[in-house]
Amino acid sequence: MTTLNEILARAGASDANRDEWLAERRLGLTATEAKHLYMGGSIDELALLKVLPASDNFKPNKYLSWGKEREPMIARDVAMEYPFLAHESRVFKSAVNDRYLASPDMIGPDGDRIALAEIKTSKHDLTPGSLHFDSTGYYYQMQWQMFVLDADYCVFAWERHHDDWSTCPDGVQRPQTIDPVQCVVIDRDEDCINGMIVVADKFFKVMDEIQKDLLS
């Protein structure tokens, strides 16, 4: 059984230092990337992006900015229901392969089990099992996180907004929330995880071949 202290010892850079955080994420496969590949994304394209000279291709938009702004508040709501969960911002490495990476939004011990939380904001209903939830691949993202951190379950927390960015009284573009934060427990799915590992290892094989060709 993996302890929380053992998991925390595998933590790397925090997104508070964006350059270090991005540099560390480029060395392996993150949960978002593992989800993308498992849903049919191009292994070759992602491998090239990893190997080519580093650049920050991240392009923020109002939805991502809103999610980042709301995350600490949603985390506080989650902690009201799950007080053992603490907000987290670091990159974690797997004990079995340090190129398997994940950055959960919350982590904590639930008795002898390890729990995570993943936080999202959306204009859509993200109830697990709904068509929109299934289309996002968030289920796979959470499975990869649980695998990397040896967690037993993940609390999926989401907050819905009305997607109207023109009504804020202070003149700043922000939507209004239309539902309280919703939380659903997602259990670990070993069959899904095993399938994702197969895809991840194919990705690393391609990535290593590209690096070898560039050095030859």
What are these regions (language model features)?
Residues 3, 39-44, 70, 74, ...:
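Alpha-helical structural motif
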Residues 7, 34, 73-75, 144, ...:
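Intrinsically disordered, low-complexity boundary segments flanking structured domains
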Residues 64, 82-104, 108-210:
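Nucleic-acid nuclease catalytic cores
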